[in-house]
Amino acid sequence: MGKVEILIIESVTPCEQCRKAEAIANELAKKYEGVTVRVINVLDPEADKFGVVMTPTVVVNGVIISVRRAPDPERLERLIKNRLGGV
């Protein structure tokens, strides 16, 4: 079984979309074993690797999947299932 890391890069003061992205990711992490969620601030040096200029930015296994809004829950779930090996 694969592993999935969801990285949410939030604004200094998390906005509504940041909080929504975090809630969606955490809900899916509870549903699927092997999924982890990390949340960092846009000022974190790690955010520089992705060239983040707008938040939230949602990254799955190193690939940006959503910018400036929470990801679509169904799309994120399909991506997770695919990365986990078709759970």
What are these regions (language model features)?
Residues 21-23, 52-55, 73-74:
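Short, glycine/charged-enriched secondary-structure capping and boundary segments
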Residues 1-27:
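Local sequence-structure signature of Cys/Sec-based thiol-disulfide redox active-site neighborhoods
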Residues 22-40:
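Conserved helix-turn-beta segment immediately C-terminal to the redox Cys motif
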Residues 61-87:
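Non-catalytic, surface beta->alpha helical segment in thiol-disulfide oxidoreductase systems
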Residues 36-54:
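Thioredoxin-like thiol-disulfide oxidoreductase module
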Residues 1-6, 49-61:
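Conserved N-terminal glycine/acidic-rich loop preference
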Residues 13-16, 47, 65:
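Glycine-/small-residue-rich active-site loops that bind phosphorylated ligands and cofactors
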